[in-house]
Each structure stands twice: as structure tokens, then as C-alpha cells.
Design a protein with these regions (language model features):
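Membrane-embedded alpha-helical bundles that constitute the cytochrome b-like, heme-associated redox core
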Residues: 1-169
């Protein structure tokens, strides 16, 4: 609701979390990308070799990693644009958020949240495999949990965007 959004905005503004937290989030996101990018195939030769080996191996985790790389690039560009847009239009308010959604930003946020959902779900899966939380016996159970997480985040996002799309400004 607009009241809840405005209450959250007032909290973020009065505690300076919007002004301080926004740049920190952006820096953490860029640092995460830089650390992860060390392993990414950037040159056409590296990408072609990766693609050839992925097709040869038929290994799901390899393809998931490629999807995670692609979503990372999408998130880096789109989330940076989102954070910069928020920081350049302070103070935050429900009216401004609704105006953005009603002004045609829905496709932008649908792509951003789809990329985020995939990236988070694949990342959690890969961390679980790396640290031995996921194994052959419980993999399907955890895949179900990841699916529930993705569906839950998608529904929360759609509900939020619907409330902004129908809000009078």
C-alpha cells in the first residue's frame, strides 16, 4: 500500500540508508561481479571454447553456470541503472515509484527480476553443491525449494508492481 511504501521511504530517508545504502549496494554488486568475473569467458576465443566443451559434456551444472554468467551481466547493467535512478531522484516516495511503473518501466523490472530470480536460485544451488549441502539424495528436494523461492519472489514482485500500477498518483 502507499502508506507502507511511504513509511519505508521515510525510514530510509531519515536514517540516511537510501543515501548511504544505495552506493554501498552498488559497490558490493560491482565487487561481486569483479570477483566472479575472473572465471568468466570474455574473449570470443574463450567463449567459443567454453561453448564447445559445454555441448560436448552435456553437464547441467555447466549450462547453469553459463546462465548465471549471462544473468550477472544483465543484473550489473540493469541494477546499476536502477540504483543510479533511485539515487538521482531522492527522496523516495510511493508516488515516484508508481509514476515510474505507470510510465512504462514494467518491462524493465520484469527482465531485471527474472534475471535476479534465476541468478539467486542458481547461485544458491551452486553454493549448496560446493559446500556439500546438496547431494544426489536431496538434490530434487532442494530444487523444489529453489522453485518455491523463485515463485515466491516473482509473486511478491508482481503484487508490488500491480499495487504501483493501479495506484492513483
Amino acid at each position: 500500500s502507499p502508506k507502507i511504501m511511504d513509511s519505508l521511504a521515510v525510514f530510509l530517508e531519515t536514517s540516511y540508508l537510501a543515501q548511504i545504502g544505495g552506493p554501498i549496494i552498488l559497490l558490493v554488486m560491482i565487487l561481486h561481479f569483479i570477483l566472479a568475473a575472473r572465471k568468466m569467458p570474455f574473449s570470443p576465443l574463450e567463449l567459443r571454447e567454453f561453448w564447445r566443451q559445454a555441448k560436448m559434456m552435456h553437464h547441467m551444472d555447466t549450462w547453469l553456470w553459463l546462465v548465471q554468467v549471462a544473468t550477472a551481466i544483465v543484473i550489473l547493467v540493469m541494477a546499476s541503472a536502477h540504483v543510479i535512478n533511485i539515487l538521482s531522484n531522492l527522496p523516495i516516495s510511493a508516488d515516484k515509484s508508481a509514476a515510474g511503473i505507470q510510465g512504462g518501466m514494467v518491462p524493465f523490472y520484469l527482465v531485471l527480476f527474472a534475471a535476479l530470480d534465476l541468478h539467486i536460485a542458481i547461485g544458491l544451488y551452486r553454493v549448496g553443491v560446493k559446500f556439500g549441502i546438496l547431494n544426489r539424495e536431496n538434490r530434487l528436494k532442494w530444487r523444489k525449494y529453489a522453485l518455491y523461492l523463485v515463485i515466491g519472489l516473482a509473486l511478491l514482485s508482481l503484487a508490488t508492481h500491480y499495487s504501483f500500477a493501479t495506484m492513483a498518483i
